[in-house]
Amino acid sequence: MASLGRKFFAVGVLSRVFPSAFNAQKGLLKNASMFLTPAFRLSPSLLPWNFSRGFKVKASVKKRCSSCYFVRRKGRLYVLCKKHPRHKTRQG
């Protein structure tokens, strides 16, 4: 069932990025072969969302580089890093 939801989500994204390829009345692809060619690829710049990294949840947190620093918020210990945002962790 989850794959069905992903399929409809992908069709929604493609219909917004390439509106001329979709039939407005039925919501179906006019020319599906355009999306099956190897030359067609969605680059990250075409997607409308900017995802930011979330926190990794760990039982014990530690600094991963010299730029990392500890912050205590809402009773939890967080590690933040401006140099490497992928180092963000929170105590679980």
UniProtKB/Swiss-Prot annotation:
Cellular component per GO, a single term: mitochondrion
Record-level Gene Ontology MF annotations: structural constituent of ribosome
List GO BP terms, alphabetically.
mitochondrial translation
> What name goes with this protein?
Large ribosomal subunit protein bL36m
Q: Which PANTHER family is this protein grouped with?
A: 39S RIBOSOMAL PROTEIN L36, MITOCHONDRIAL (PTHR46909), LARGE RIBOSOMAL SUBUNIT PROTEIN BL36M (PTHR46909:SF1)
The subunit structure is: Component of the mitochondrial large ribosomal subunit (mt-LSU). Mature yeast 74S mitochondrial ribosomes consist of a small (37S) and a large (54S) subunit. The 37S small subunit contains a 15S ribosomal RNA (15S mt-rRNA) and at least 32 different proteins. The 54S large subunit contains a 21S rRNA (21S mt-rRNA) and at least 45 different proteins. bL36m has a zinc binding site.
Using the UniProt entry, state which stretch of residues is the transit peptide: 1-54
Subcellular location per UniProt equals: Mitochondrion
Function per UniProt: Component of the mitochondrial ribosome (mitoribosome), a dedicated translation machinery responsible for the synthesis of mitochondrial genome-encoded proteins, including at least some of the essential transmembrane subunits of the mitochondrial respiratory chain. The mitoribosomes are attached to the mitochondrial inner membrane and translation products are cotranslationally integrated into the membrane. bL36m may be involved in a process influencing telomere capping.
* Keywords, comma-separated and alphabetical: Mitochondrion, Ribonucleoprotein, Ribosomal protein, Transit peptide
Q: Does the keyword Ribosomal protein apply?
A: yes
NCBIfam families named in the record = rpmJ_bact
**Corresponding gene?**
rtc6
